[in-house]
A protein has these predicted regions:
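An active-site-proximal structural segment forming one wall of the substrate-binding cleft
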Residues: 1-5
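Residue-level detector of anion-binding/catalytic polar loops
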Residues: 8
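Short, internal active-site loops enriched in acidic
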Residues: 15-17
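Histidine-acidic metal/acid-base catalytic patches
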Residues: 19-139
Length: 139
């Protein structure tokens, strides 16, 4: 149905072992074999998955999605925690993450950050915008 409307669907890499890597997402993309089903990796979820014993390096995992990534989801995390981590306070090397995605042709990005009731939410939005843009060339 989505293909009839030209809509692309992307599997977001999850917080759970079921589909927390590009490699796992690609299994379904290859099974379905539709140009309308692709991968939407979440940087934070990928990073935490890469910390599991025997896991691939996060940047090698991203490479496995070459040609099948519709956009990249930029989110900060710390080991074992996936939500409400402010940009720049966790484990993500955003420069390397962005460069890796750009190197395989990904040019669409989403930034995920959290409102947790803070009064200075507008400043948080401005900071997130500035922080993420600072990791892209020519912006």
């Amino acid at each position: 149905m989505a293909s009839q409307k030209g809509i692309l669907l992307g599997f977001e890499t999850m917080e759970t072992p079921f589909m927390n890597t590009v490699e796992k997402s690609m299994r379904f993309v290859e099974l379905v074999k539709s140009p309308y089903l692709q991968v939407y990796p979440d940087s934070g979820n990928l990073m935490n998955a890469s910390l599991e014993p025997g896991a691939k390096n996060v940047y090698e995992d991203i490479e496995l999605g070459r040609g099948h990534i519709v956009a990249a989801h930029l989110k900060e995390t710390i080991p074992g925690h996936y939500r409400e981590i402010p940009f720049g306070t966790g484990q993500i090397d955003f420069k390397r993450m962005v460069d890796t995605f750009l190197s395989i042709g990904v040019n669409r990005f989403t930034g995920e950050f959290w409102y947790v009731g803070q009064e200075n939410w507008l400043e948080d939005i401005k900071f997130a915008n500035q922080f993420l843009r600072s990791h892209f060339p020519n912006i």
